Amino acid sequence: HPHEPLWLDVPVRTSQEAADHLGVAVGQIAKSVIFKRKSDDRAVLVITSGDRRVDEKKVAALTGALGRADADFVKAKTGFSIGGVAPLAHSETPVTLIDRELLRFDVVWAAAGHPNGVFALQPAQLEALTGGAPVVDVVQAT
């Protein structure tokens, strides 16, 4: 399978830990950040580059007002625990946005639903696997 998970011998809960273990740039880690949309309690997933911080105001401008997603909300809406949230295969389909910064790389690495699991894919494949999620500017200026 082209997206078969790579199982690491230790959990990697941050982008930096994942990059260090994989020997790749931290920006190549596609981290999944979950917010709670206030209007309907729907999960909002931002798949962002590991070396960037999500700008919540930019996301809210595209999705509506956001609230904090605690660990229970993340688990209920995605089926995954914080630290292992995959960018796809969620319990409930989230509103999904892809950070355009990921397009800097030919290959990115994402969590495979477990803190020890990651998988590689091209940013275009990530778009396809998320059902054509929009690629947008959702990060803080560097």
Spell out what each predicted region is.
Residues 1-142:
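Extended, low-hydrophobicity, polar/charged segments
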